[in-house]
Amino acid sequence: MSLLCVGVKKAKFDGAQEKFNTYVTLKVQNVKSTTIAVRGSQPSWEQDFMFEINRLDLGLTVEVWNKGLIWDTMVGTVWIPLRTIRQSNEEGPGEWLTLDSQAIMADSEICGTKDPTFHRILLDAHFELPLDIPEEEARYWAKKLEQLNAMRDQDEYSFQDQQDKPLPVPSSQCCNWNYFGWGEQNDDPDSAVDDRDSDYRSETSNSIPPPYYTTSQPNASVHQYSVRPPPLGSRESYSDSMHSYEEFSEPRALSPTGSSRYASSGELSQGSSQLSEDFDPDEHSLQGSELDDERDRDSYHSCHSSVSYHKDSPRWDQDDEDLEDLEDLEDEELPEEEEELEEEGEEELEEEDLEEEEEVPDDLASYTQQEDTTVAEPKEFKRISFPTAAPQKDDKVSAVPTEAPEVAKGIPKAATPEEKAAAERAQEAEPPKSEESFRSREEEEGQEGQDAMSRAKANWLRAFNKVRMQLQEARGEGDMSKSLWFKGGPGGGLIIIDSMPDIRKRKPIPLVSDLAMSLVQSRKAGITSALASSTLNNEELKNHVYKKTLQALIYPISCTTPHNFEVWTATTPTYCYECEGLLWGIARQGMRCTECGVKCHEKCQDLLNADCLQRAAEKSSKHGAEDRTQNIIMVLKDRMKIRERNKPEIFELIQEIFAVTKSAHTQQMKAVKQSVLDGTSKWSAKISITVVCAQGLQAKDKTGSSDPYVTVQVGKTKKRTKTIYGNLNPVWEENFHFECHNSSDRIKVRVWDEDDDIKSRVKQRFKRESDDFLGQTIIEVRTLSGEMDVWYNLDKRTDKSAVSGAIRLHISVEIKGEEKVAPYHVQYTCLHENLFHFVTDVQNNGVVKIPDAKGDDAWKVYYDETAQEIVDEFAMRYGVESIYQAMTHFACLSSKYMCPGVPAVMSTLLANINAYYAHTTASTNVSASDRFAASNFGKERFVKLLDQLHNSLRIDLSMYRNNFPASSPERLQDLKSTVDLLTSITFFRMKVQELQSPPRASQVVKDCVKACLNSTYEYIFNNCHELYGREYQTDPAKKGEVPPEEQGPSIKNLDFWSKLITLIVSIIEEDKNSYTPCLNQFPQELNVGKISAEVMWSLFAQDMKYAMEEHDKHRLCKSADYMNLHFKVKWLYNEYVAELPTFKDRVPEYPAWFEPFVIQWLDENEEVSRDFLHGALERDKKDGFQQTSEHALFSCSVVDVFSQLNQSFEIIKKLECPDPQIVGHYMRRFAKTISNVLLQYADIVSKDFASYCSKEKEKVPCILMNNTQQLRVQLEKMFEAMGGKELDAEASGTLKELQVKLNNVLDELSHVFATSFQPHIEECVRQMGDILSQVKGTGNVPASACSSVAQDADNVLQPIMDLLDSNLTLFAKICEKTVLKRVLKELWKLVMNTMEKTIVLPPLTDQTMIGTLLRKHGKGLEKGRVKLPSHSDGTQMIFNAAKELGQLSKLKDHMVREEAKSLTPKQCAVVELALDTIKQYFHAGGVGLKKTFLEKSPDLQSLRYALSLYTQATDLLIKTFVQTQSAQGSGVEDPVGEVSVHVELFTHPGTGEQKVTVKVVAANDLKWQTSGIFRPFIEVNIVGPQLSDKKRKFATKSKNNSWAPKYNESFQFSLSADAGPECYELQVCVKDYCFAREDRTVGLAVLQLRELAQRGSAACWLPLGRRIHMDDTGLTVLRILSQRSNDEVAKEFVKLKSDTRSAEEGGAAPAP
């Protein structure tokens, strides 16, 4: 991707001024940009546009359009090929291009233009160049260019030519060979954006590294801009060089710091503090003076060294000879031993398996930790791998280039597991590109064979794929997870289900904290010392720093003599030494030092900080006052002697730090003292100052702007820049040179606003400063060394000054005698690092000694008193800022960040560093990132340090249980501080670096905690048996060795899971009680205890689910074992997981795992319950069904049965299943168990119940009925306990159905029990009948006779009352209320029915036999009841019985004999009164049956209705019969023939008299057999009220032997005018005429006249039935009428309705 910058400047058009209103459009790669519209023939736009270009074979289309009223017209166009556009980092003056009028098209794309116009446009287009490649790399490319130029015999090209050539497009780094560790020399280890911290990068750079480097340079405040021009060379050659290098690059031996051959570590030039040690030139590195020589060479701005080419790039088809030459050249450069090692490495990689531990050489380990930040996967964690110790937040895998060198220092190195993992992730991120790129490169090699490098790449790919497969297997990605469950184990015996498992929490065991893990960590904690302590081995630098330290400490600034100022009066115009302003006033104008004579304003005296003694000595020596000088020198000598005598420990410590011998130290002390005495008299330096630019200046002009310029003064020499008009962010780029001979001088840089108005001219007359002051910065010369590029904040001069902004200066100082030394900041770094190394590693065995300091500035105290004084005095002497000191100490501590107490110190340090940069003051508006960029420590260096520290902290937090054991309060405090440090790093990235969305510290820690928990779970899972035995096994007998195959999960037992739950609980408890209070910085976002529970449960749930599925297939354990495990899992979930936000509103899965086993247990439980039921009933039977207690009316079998059921239900209930669906399944199954058990109980009781009733023991049947009722009561309670209305619908239905069945059983038992009293009741009622028959009197009873009626009623009731009284009293005592009411109901029915049948409606004639027959037909005595509203089969049954016995005909004779027992009205009154008494008795004052029930009882109503019928007239009874019996002839299923009749109904209009005319037409299909002649005739009867005086019957003539006779005879009946047709009916009867005997009935039919009431007439076929159908009401009317022997109409009616088809005789067959 390249950045194309296009500036549209102006244009010149041929035409009138007013004709044009134009705008410009730019099109490239489907992107279009447009300028504003400008009027005139010479418009000026001055607009810049930027495009991202990834194809250089296209072009930029520029079109100029003229705006119109309706549409726009094109003025002209020009097409610029992208290849022709120059590369530059600066804007050019632009180029005038002629516009053409037409575009040339090819394949629908513009490829040029034609037909020029007279219009022209000024455009400036250039590609941006990459910035800041390391100087070393620049020299390398320059060297390559020279070699290629020599090979091709080409001379230098001009720089302009070079600019005009296109820059090849660099490919994305996501697709280069750094994935596989090749071409690592192309990778810049110091690139901040290309850092390997994937978590950090994934949120800041979208996982795509930028195409160019931004490499840090030594002592750089901002970037080190090159001040030398780049070397001239062929752009073509340069491109080819890049191409070839990419194609044939080979792995190189790495330097000890891990920096590559050509890409410097970012700190190599200018005596860098990052230089680890001197290099040998043969090993492609720099040493000694060669470094200095190289420093003078030209640097070159190169593009990113991993540039690759597309096939359509301009130089793709270059001749191959260049490439071959380069290949030969590079082969020569590769040492032989490296080639051999390459081959060895290939073999090793092919044979290598993924091992548990790998030994890495120290230097390589150092390299790996510094440069390759891929995280070493802890060996004991086999389930998970976390590349940066924290899982990615999204599914994208960051494409992080991973360096994997094959050789270092001649030692072969195989790929470490970390690198394999990184390679795997990279391969997963972009496998297609990598393979395609690899294939394309292989094709380029040709068919002859591959060179060594290509073979190495192929081997790498093979090894990588192999490792990738192994990693997949190791992670269990194959189908191997289920094999876990096929391991054997001891079987468990039957145990009682423990619904409250005792998961022991007696102590939070440090399972993984203090116990040795299965493998040791391969990575040492701490950032590599190569980064933090780069100066330890630089002896030359150390020697120089040693001298400078002595110099700073022998006469420290803190001991300098202050000026002795006094008020002074100037006699001549005098100027302030500090601000150079005139000392105004007549007298006492300023201050003057009595010792050295310096004069200044009163306000400026504090700005003069030079040592008065040294200043006096300098002044005296210059003016020849030797005596005075000698005095001062003596004072200085004395002071240094006193210093040395009073503070000997300081100089001894300095000697020990730099390991200087005693004699050498003594000599050096003398030399240092002499240099101090010499002061500045022999000191001189050349200072070069470049005023680069300024930002954020104050606006002083009325226009809201300023015209700034800068004055620079060193000593008395003052220079100024040019003025930049109207700009608050001016750029000057002006260089000034000074010579300085006084180290106490200061550089005064002041910014002014130039004014050229009258006011300023007047001001100039009176003041030396006519311009407005914009700010200043004062720089001590003695603090300068080497080269510096620094932003300085502009300071005020007085309190009234309005100042803002900052100025950037590039300062180069060459001090005489110190031309080649490092800058003072680098020297300070050397001092600090060596001091830290000495105090920590030498004196304290690697443990950081933390000083005891308090107060606001405690963070600035890094060592104890002596060492702290050394660094402070050095910093003060040489101008090292306190923030630089802090950053340096932070870098030192980062190498020991795992030492006790260090994280807290680092956290405080970084917090103060953050505050320094992020908290801007009112005096400056420079952003935090700009302030940080101006840091002398080096922006990139510090960012990289933080990135690597961040990465390492994440790794260690991902093993917090190891690194910060809960048993150590000190380490827990370190853990807390470590998180604080992470938070400070995040704050730094957000506020100082100003990154958009750095990873939140809380999220990072959360990911680390999860990673640690993952590995902890894996560890306890794999070592469950051993850990449990060690911590919890108290029984020595159980501590025996268990075979390895039985230590894991088994399908034969469940012990493993119980132990695992115990261990999980201990882990969660440890996190909850130890780590949660410690990591409390993010209360809303991070709770370690909750995360622990969540992760542990998630992993446990996954394994448990698979295990239970496996167990479900085999079922080798007892159901009780599964239930016990279920309770433990339930407890674990409820105790730790249920309230977690993730699971709170979710139905957990664990009940589903155990559902089949719970159902199995319920199945088994039903069998147990049934066996228990039989046992309980047998015991109860033996005991005689005794009451369980005095107050309980039921026996113990009910209690036993429900105790067992309740226990079973309690177990189900205690499962507390949170899944409603599964609860429903359990309830359904348990409801079936309840139903089966209780119904079995009821069946057993029902079978034997009758036998208990037959004995003269009323108590046992009552107890059994009470038991049944108690079943119903307990069932209702259980229904409520199971959920009541909320219970599953199916289970609820089962229990309700069971309740109905038990109710029916109770009804049946009550009926059976009551029926056992029937013989006694019948006997009593017969006695009542006999007493009633003796009651005399007819007609209605007068009021005066009421008392006699009551007396008669009492007499009549006497027998039944005696029976009821004796029994009901007993029942009330031994029956439950519900049972008692049921028994009373049955007895009530029995009494009522018996009275009705025996007294009110006695049976016809042969009562006993008819009663017996009725019972035989299954209807019992109750069939005689009157049921007014309903129809039943009672009538038919009676007639059937009568027919079978031939007794119905006796009904016809009934009235002839005097056997009928017809009740008189008085007797009816007595019966009525007796009924009321019986009713009151059964009500029993509310204890018995309810009055409403008794009143509405159908039995009572039937009896009363029968009594009421006794008092009704015959006509009324006949009318009732006709109106109620509407189905006498209907429903004839088996007709015996049919009769055709025509009926007409006529009403006289005057009298209202009604007549019915009946025409008998014919009969048909008569079914009759007779031995004689068949003579059918038809008889028609009219039935109804008030017909006693009218003719009621007609008959036709008979027909001989005709089964379908025709009659056509008409008859007329007269009806009463008082009753309507609905009260009458016609009964048609077909008979066989017999001469000598009674006619035989063939069939009967009834036609009710109500059907003709509307129509008036009807012709119809009437089917003939065998008898008349009637209900109980009809039968009752018939029986009452049958007792009226003196009533002809009644007798005739009874005979008519009781007639049935006669018996047939065998004879002739019916006619067809």
Curated annotation (Swiss-Prot):
Residues holding Zn(2+) 2: C593, C596, C612
InterPro entries found in the cross-reference section: C1-like_sf, C2_dom, C2_domain_sf, MUN_dom, Munc13_1, Munc13_dom-2, PE/DAG-bd, Unc-13
Ranges where the C2 domain occurs: 1-97, 668-792, 1535-1662
Composition skew (Acidic residues), residue ranges: 318-362
Keywords: Calcium, Cell membrane, Cell projection, Coiled coil, Cytoplasm, Differentiation, Exocytosis, Membrane, Metal-binding, Phosphoprotein, Repeat, Synapse, Zinc, Zinc-finger
Cofactor(s) recorded in Swiss-Prot or TrEMBL: Ca(2+)
Annotated binding of Ca(2+) 2, by residue: D701, D753, D755, D772
Effect of H563V: Reduces number of fusion-competent vesicles in neurons
Subcellular location(s) per record: Cytoplasm; Cell membrane; Presynaptic cell membrane; Presynaptic active zone
Domain MHD2: 1354-1521
GO molecular function, one term: calmodulin binding
PANTHER family listed in its UniProt record: PROTEIN UNC-13 HOMOLOG, PROTEIN UNC-13 HOMOLOG A
Subunit (UniProt): Interacts with the N-termini of STX1A and/or STX1B1 and DOC2A. Interacts with BSN. Interacts with RIMS1 which recruits UNC13A to the active zone. Forms homodimers via its first C2 domain. Also interacts via this domain with the zinc finger domain of RIMS2. Part of a complex consisting of ERC2, RIMS1 and UNC13A. Also part of a complex consisting of UNC13A, RIMS2 and RAB3A. Interacts with FBXO45 (via SRY domain); leading to the degradation of UNC13A by the proteasome.
Name of this protein: Protein unc-13 homolog A
Organism name: Mus musculus (Mouse)
Designated gene of the protein: Unc13a
